[in-house]
């Protein structure tokens, strides 16, 4: 499985960007994406940017990665805040709801 890590751009140079998160700072190859700007978020795999992310998507990916760490650490209590919607019933998308038979009146 490949897991991309969201990193924030701190400084830019041709073909690379200095990026960081709570685990440190490192140079990332940016030749596969449009040139980023300081403050942008990059999805990084093997020290190469694969995608420029908006802040919301970067936050969701970071939360999912924290959830994986909590599971690996055996801390199920930490999952409640990371997956607050687990107690709701899943909803089918509209195109699949349209294929369901009509509900019988009760």
Swiss-Prot record:
Q: Which GO terms describe its biological process?
A: protein maturation
Q: InterPro entries from the xrefs?
A: Hydgase_assmbl_chp_CS, Hydrogenase_HupF/HypC
Lineage, top-rank taxon, reads: Bacteria
Q: Which GO terms describe its molecular function?
A: carbon dioxide binding; iron ion binding
Q: Which SUPFAM superfamilies match?
A: HupF/HypC-like
Give a single Pfam family match. HupF_HypC
Q: Which family does it belong to?
A: Belongs to the HupF/HypC family.
**Which PANTHER family does its entry note?**
HYDROGENASE MATURATION FACTOR HYBG, HYDROGENASE MATURATION FACTOR HYPC
Tell me the protein's name: Hydrogenase expression/formation protein HoxL
